[in-house]
Structures are given as structure tokens and as C-alpha cells.
Amino acid sequence: MSSPRVVSLGGGHGLAAMLQALRVVTPHLTAIVTVADNGGSSGRLREEFHSLPPGDLRMALAALCGDDDWGRSWAEIMQYRFTSSGELNGHALGNLLLTALWDRDGDPVQGLDRVGALLKVVGRVLPMALQPLDIEATFRNWEGVHVIRGQKEVAAGKGRLEDLRLIPEDARPTPEGLSAIAEADWITLGPGSWFSSVLPHLLVAEQREALYNVKGKILIALNLDAVATKSGDELA
């Protein structure tokens, strides 16, 4: 019996945990990662280079690194974060490497594939879209209605979510991601911050249509526990 083809949608630590589990089951893995991060090292590089935020993509690559000394060593190097009193403070080395490749070649998918080959990753890592996105949400609480913009801000939003949208709204997925979804035996959504890492995948029109028409099965992985600062985690 051949190994199943699995596409995993999400972002951040939740997606990384899912990938670490799935890689034991199948080598035919495609991770499709949110590209709306606006905080920390990713946010700084995104603003300076007008590039995709690399952090969640870096974490997915590290989670799928080759299971040998070479792969594990490079995964640790990719996750290495500088501590200094200068401009490098807080930057992860993997973020800088991905941004350098994108800046040089202008091709996010090629850059991810190059780093994937370096790390001997199991499967493939793709961005949810080829341009950096912003997440905007409308929450209602006892103080009234509030519009919040930004991935880290939406993740910590309080109250009942009334609307969630991407900016720009016409974001286009990668052809490679759409093909992987169409051919998948299984698609996973979650775990993670639902409002900022998982549900945005359903706001990309072409990707949502591909998921609606998929022949494989869809698995939704809820969070084991809620995080007090993450409103979207209350779904668990």
C-alpha cells in the first residue's frame, strides 16, 4: 500500500507540530503556510524588503528537515535567533536566508525549494499566496464593535468574531498548492490560532474552491487547550 498524499494547511507552531507528526506517516507531504505575519523578525523583513514574512515558512521547513545529522543540524541553524544590541537582534537566521533568496531571485517558491533541498526536507513547503497579506477582523464585545488589523493583533482579539477578511481580498494561491490539494488523499486544517493561521486559508477564493471540490478527506485538528491571549483558540 502506497503512502497517502497529504496537504497540511496552517501556520506557526500548530502547523509545525502537525508536520512533525505527519512526516512519520508519509513522505508525500505539502505544507501550505499563511503569509500574513506582521510581528517580530518576519514583520521587520516584510516591511523592509516588501517580501513574504518568512517565519512560519521557516518553521515548517525546520519541522520537515531530514532525519539525519545534516538535516537536524541545518534545522537548528535555521531556527537560530541572534541576540545583540544591533540591527540583527531578534532575527532568525532562516528568516534572513529565505529573504535573501527571494530578494535575489524574485521567486518565493524556488527559494523555498532551494532551502528545502539544503535541509533534505520530507515533502514540500509552499506559501498560501505569492504576496504578503494582512488579516482584518471585526470583533464585538461589551465595549462595542472593533475592527482589528494584523495577524498578531487578530490572534489576541477579544469578543465574538463577526467578520474576517484578507487584504488584498483577491489574493492568488500558488499553482503548485492548488495541484497538491487536487491530488491529495488527505487535507489537514489546524491546530493553531484559528482566526489568524487557519481560517485565512478559506479566504483565498481559488484555494477555497479547490478545497470544496477536493476528492480526498479533510481532517480538522482542534487545539488541545485554549490560550488566554488567543481568541481563536476558544474553539477548542
Question: Predicted regions span which residues?
Answer:
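Charged helix-capping and loop-helix junction motifs
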Residues: 201-208, 234-236
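An anion/phosphate-binding loop that grips the pyrophosphate of nucleotide cofactors and donors
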Residues: 184
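Gly/lys/ser-thr-rich phosphate-binding loops in alpha/beta enzymes
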Residues: 1-55
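Short, glycine-/small-residue-rich phosphate/pyrophosphate-handling segment
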Residues: 40-43, 229-236
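Electropositive, gly/pro-rich neighborhoods at or near active sites that engage anionic ligands
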Residues: 34-159, 165
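Glycine/threonine-rich flexible loop motifs
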Residues: 194-204, 229-230
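Active-site glycine-rich loop that binds ribose-phosphate moieties when present
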Residues: 163-178, 203
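A short helix->loop->beta-strand "cap" motif at the edges of active sites that frequently abuts
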Residues: 26-27, 213-218
